Amino acid sequence: MYVEVLKSKIHRVTITEANLNYVGSITIDEDLMDAANIIAGEKVQIVDNNNGARLETYTIPGKRGSGVICLNGAAARIVHPGDIIIIMAYAWMPMEEAKVFKPAVVFPDTATNKIILK
């Protein structure tokens, strides 16, 4: 049996931009993506701590070291600059593997979006 489990989490990061006219997705500083083991184009779930909204989209790498977190497309109407969000990615794996699997969890500084703990 396979189960879906948390694979990656960027816990409490601040939205720096929102671009309504972009095709879609979330742009994430590539340093954060690497630290959380999230790849370009990967499906992620976004949870907005300010308004409780949840949505799914895919990732686009942003400039390394920039701290950029930009919601693009329709999501820009739901999540706004200054909001604190959690970004999560999931993976399917066999039950026995899932029991011992440890997700990559990153804790950025919400003022700079730089990694302070992982």
Swiss-Prot record:
SUPFAM superfamilies xrefs: ADC-like
Subcellular location(s) of the protein: Cytoplasm
Signal peptide: none
GO cellular component term of the entry, any: cytosol
GO MF annotations in UniProt: aspartate 1-decarboxylase activity
GO biological process, one term: pantothenate biosynthetic process
Cofactor note: Binds 1 pyruvoyl group covalently per subunit.
EC number(s) given by UniProt: 4.1.1.11
Residues binding substrate: T57, G73, A74, A75
Entry-annotated residues carrying Pyruvic acid (Ser): S25
A Pfam short name: Asp_decarbox
Keywords: Autocatalytic cleavage, Cytoplasm, Decarboxylase, Lyase, Pantothenate biosynthesis, Pyruvate, Schiff base, Zymogen
Enzyme class, UniProt record, top EC level: lyase
NCBIfam families assigned to the protein according to its UniProt record, in alphabetical order: panD (TIGR00223)
Complexes and interactors: Heterooctamer of four alpha and four beta subunits.
This protein's name: Aspartate 1-decarboxylase
Originating organism: Porphyromonas gingivalis (strain ATCC BAA-308 / W83)
